[in-house]
């Protein structure tokens, strides 16, 4: 795109102020999301790694001498009423339809997720809700992404969808970080993850009470993160649309706004 540049130095400074305000807000939103992700990880670690989830009296379980028992499959002590399961028992795993790169365009509204996260945009989506998608081909095998609602997930990623939809999928996203995903990777030439190899991964299975309680606590963090990402997209689009209009003089800046 050819953009005609403003020659007036004061106008250039005003334009820079406006664009800088967009960049600052976008950076702030990304920082908020980083903090939200860190909080979600910390919560999982505290409850499901250190086992200091709230017991029946609201006290941290393990620190309050909650009974622990050895689990042979997980090779560790876990709370007495907890057990193990496999990824395939609690999740549906599948690879959706792949899109050709020629069909993607930055002008389309819906994000497309592949092996390396967002790979472009498309005019349709194949998943209504936010999903957990794992890269299953190439050097990025095992990398996890939370997709945005109304996104297209390609066959280069494995969708990992909890069968029990009363449980927030942040649980499985965090649990997979502690599973032996690397050991499930196969392929002598190009690394790959198959559904069969992933389905047998051992996962900790907390009590239903704790899973539901965890979901209630973590859901607002996930919702906030998704909303921040939507605002980042909106601000980025506005900035990119506004830039050429400002530079060629089609849009002018109110001097009161430029001084804010």
Region locations from a protein language model:
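Non-catalytic DNA-recognition/assembly elements of restriction-modification systems
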Residues: 4-46, 65-114, 210-254
């Amino acid at each position: 795109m050819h953009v005609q540049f403003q020659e007036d130095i004061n106008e250039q400074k005003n334009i820079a102020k406006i664009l800088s305000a967009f960049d600052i807000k976008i950076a702030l939103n990304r920082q908020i999301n980083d903090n939200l992700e860190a909080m979600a990880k910390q919560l999982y670690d505290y409850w499901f790694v250190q086992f200091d989830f709230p017991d029946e009296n609201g006290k941290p379980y393990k620190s309050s001498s909650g009974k622990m028992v050895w689990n042979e499959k997980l090779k560790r002590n876990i709370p007495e009423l907890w057990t193990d399961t496999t990824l395939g028992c609690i999740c549906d795993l599948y690879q959706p339809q792949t899109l050709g790169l020629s069909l993607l365009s930055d002008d389309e509204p819906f994000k497309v997720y592949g092996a390396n996260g967002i790979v472009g945009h498309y005019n349709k989506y194949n998943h209504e809700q936010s999903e957990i998608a794992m890269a299953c081909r190439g050097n990025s095998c095992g990398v996890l992404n939370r997709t945005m609602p109304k996104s297209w997930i390609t066959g280069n990623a494995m969708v990992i969808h909890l069968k029990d939809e009363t449980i927030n999928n942040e649980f499985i996203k965090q649990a997979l970080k502690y599973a032996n995903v690397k050991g499930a990777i196969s392929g002598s030439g190009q690394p790959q993850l198959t559904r069969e190899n992933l389905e047998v991964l051992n996962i900790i299975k907390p009590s239903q009470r704790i899973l539901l309680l965890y979901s209630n606590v973590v859901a607002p963090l996930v919702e906030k993160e998704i909303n921040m990402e939507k605002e980042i997209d909106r601000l980025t689009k506005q900035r990119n649309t506004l830039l050429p209009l400002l530079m060629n003089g089609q849009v002018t800046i109110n001097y009161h706004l430029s001084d804010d």
